[in-house]
A protein has these predicted regions:
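Short beta-strand element of the alpha/beta-hydrolase
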Residues: 93-101
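Alpha/beta-hydrolase active-site loop
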Residues: 140-161
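Primarily recognizes the serine-hydrolase "nucleophile elbow" in alpha/beta-hydrolase
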Residues: 156-160, 165-194
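Short N-terminal helix/helix-N-cap motif within the alpha/beta-hydrolase-1
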Residues: 57, 106-108, 134
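Conserved alpha/beta-hydrolase
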Residues: 116-136
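An N-terminal hydrophobic leader/cap segment in hydrolases
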Residues: 4, 15-73
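A short loop-to-beta-strand scaffold at the N-terminal edge of the catalytic core in hydrolase folds
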Residues: 76-87
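The serine-hydrolase catalytic nucleophile loop
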Residues: 102-116
Length: 194
């Protein structure tokens, strides 16, 4: 009987060790996917032009006109956070802040930016979340702390585009979750839609 109990205890300890080890590995893999993200960052424009050929002439025209610009803010922990932005083709107070998903970046959201900017005539701001794209950071934060950065990006967009905007905050995948977390915070008067 003692042998059976001892064997079960050893088996349970091995199972617990495997579960803890596997969990730590998966957590590290999901929050720090370095190789995956570097490859995505390096090929973002090529990927977007291949998947959405209509983007190339639009992005080229924005770049030729100097209308697709970079901006940065300093995060709460001192890290550099990056975003792309472009003014609408005609002056407007309508602005969209577009938040990307897990392991994506601002460039990979240009197809949504095209919809808002080219088709609907909105000003757009596309942030790279913490540890994504050209932003610094130590690990993916899965949206909870990112909500505070998005609130700051909303203020930046409002300032860049005239100070009295009517804003929509749009997210895809993890960006949608971040957007919903932002919606639970006290809102600025210029935010109209999520």
């Amino acid at each position: 009987m003692k042998r059976i109990v001892r064997s079960l205890v050893v088996l349970l300890l091995l199972l617990a060790a495997a579960l803890v080890g596997g969990s730590l590995y998966m957590l590290s893999y999901s929050l720090r996917p370095d190789a995956t993200m570097r490859a995505k960052n390096a090929s973002s424009y090529e990927y977007m032009y291949g998947e959405y050929p209509f983007l190339r002439p639009w992005v080229d025209s924005l770049e030729r006109a100097g209308a697709l610009r970079d901006t940065v803010i300093t995060g709460n922990e001192g890290e550099r956070l990056h975003a792309l932005y472009a003014a609408a083709p005609r002056p407007t107070d309508r602005t969209a802040v577009i938040v990307h998903g897990y392991t994506d970046n601002a460039v990979r959201m240009l197809m949504i930016g095209y919809l808002y900017n080219h088709d609907l005539g909105y000003n757009i701001l596309l942030p790279d979340l913490y540890y994504h794209g050209r932003s610094e950071g130590r690990a993916i934060r899965m949206g909870w702390k990112d909500r505070l950065d998005v609130l700051r990006w909303m203020d930046v967009a409002n300032d860049i585009f005239g100070g009295d905007t009517r804003m929509v905050v749009h997210g895809i995948s993890m960006g949608a979750a971040t957007t919903m977390m932002v919606s639970g915070e006290e809102q600025r008067p210029y935010v109209k839609f999520f």
